[in-house]
Amino acid sequence: MSNENRTCSFCGKSKSHVKHLIEGENAFICDECVSNCIEILHEDGNDGTPSESAGGEPEESGKLPTPAEIVANLNDHVIGQEQAKKALAVSVYNHYKRLRHPKARANVELSKSNILLIGPTGSGKTLLAQSLARKLDVPFVMADATTLTEAGYVGEDVEQIITKLLGKCDFDVEKAQRGIVYIDEIDKISRKSDNPSITRDVSGEGVQQALLKLIEGTVASVPPQGGRKHPNQEFINVDTTNILFICGGAFAGLEKVIRQRTEKGGIGFGASVHSKDENADITKLFGIVEPEDLIKFGLIPELIGRLPVIATLEELDEDALINILTEPKNALVKQYQALFGMENVELEFEEGALRSIARQAMERKTGARGLRSIVERCLLDTMYRLPDLQGLKKVVVGKAVIEEGREPELVFES
């Protein structure tokens, strides 16, 4: 073949249209295609000379935040729950430290520190997991255990969790394999009884078994983008061994199981006297939970064994809810003040109003999750009229607005 007729085997450009044409044994490549290849390798985080460890895994770069730094970051987003924050921070730090030092794992087998969060609705379980993933800059996905089914049943099978995780990082398998999965409502798939003679919730136990494989580490085959619409596409294999799983649930009724184990006396003069403060009582009981209590509640022993770190969250009291309304970076009061500020209007919540909002959330048993709906309801009419209220300078929300449904006080320019 003459020099003039030679073309790049990749883009088809002739020698006269490129600066350089590199000749191989049976092919040619131009300088432009070489540059494109280098760019692709850099985008994948690989410069062509990967530093592989003894375990065949690439070393990760960047500073891993210490447990104290992780807790400090969580404090910006989540109020209270100090013990849960510490437990999470240490577990997450050890998990990612383990991934960054694969050579150490060649001599000692380090187990994964998956986490079980136990706490009432609205106590901050989901927010803790989300904030952790954001701080560590890793892919994060949340799944609802109640929507999961065994393979062969209508609904989501557990491997769809991994499909969602892949989607969060543009189907980058390496990133997904170091992500965090939060499974909410794990208590809702417990079997109905620990007695084998009583009919069990087979579907719930089946989901637990399926989750067990995923959590302990397996190679999940998931469909690529498009899934069933492109049946001829090859499946993507994702190793879940290094994915950190955090499971959470309210575990309503678990306190009765713990109480049965801990109480010595049953009736008469030897019977235990319970605290009038039921919430404080439950928080104390959750603090002494043992794996055997969770088995009796309905989780299978194998699953509990794969969730070695158990962190309990406290019921939020009135003061904690007020702090949630006002203190975090994304506090509700700050959010609404920013929205009103866009209309050049100042928004003020009086102390009595904040206490009433917190009290209503406690009465509804919704914790921090119920705060937004209460605030939204009391400000709805004002926000509807806000763009049309000429000369409005300030809106004041008092106690009567929350408790009696009155309109907030409107202060106009004089």
UniProtKB/Swiss-Prot annotation:
One of its GO terms (biological process) is proteolysis involved in protein catabolic process. The keyword Transcription does not apply. ATP binds at residues 120-127. InterPro entries: AAA+_ATPase, ATP-dep_Clp_protease_ClpX, ATPase_AAA_core, Clp_ATPase_C, Clp_protease_ATP-bd_su_ClpX, ClpX_bact, P-loop_NTPase, Znf_CppX_C4. GO terms for cellular component: HslUV protease complex. GO terms for molecular function: ATP binding; ATP hydrolysis activity; ATP-dependent protein folding chaperone; protein dimerization activity; unfolded protein binding; zinc ion binding. Zn(2+) binds at residues 8, 11, 30, 33. PROSITE patterns: CLPX_ZB. Keywords: ATP-binding, Chaperone, Metal-binding, Nucleotide-binding, Zinc. Residues 44-65 are annotated as: Disordered. ATP-dependent specificity component of the Clp protease. It directs the protease to specific substrates. Can perform chaperone functions in the absence of ClpP. Belongs to the ClpX chaperone family. Component of the ClpX-ClpP complex. Forms a hexameric ring that, in the presence of ATP, binds to fourteen ClpP subunits assembled into a disk-like structure with a central cavity, resembling the structure of eukaryotic proteasomes. This is ATP-dependent Clp protease ATP-binding subunit ClpX.
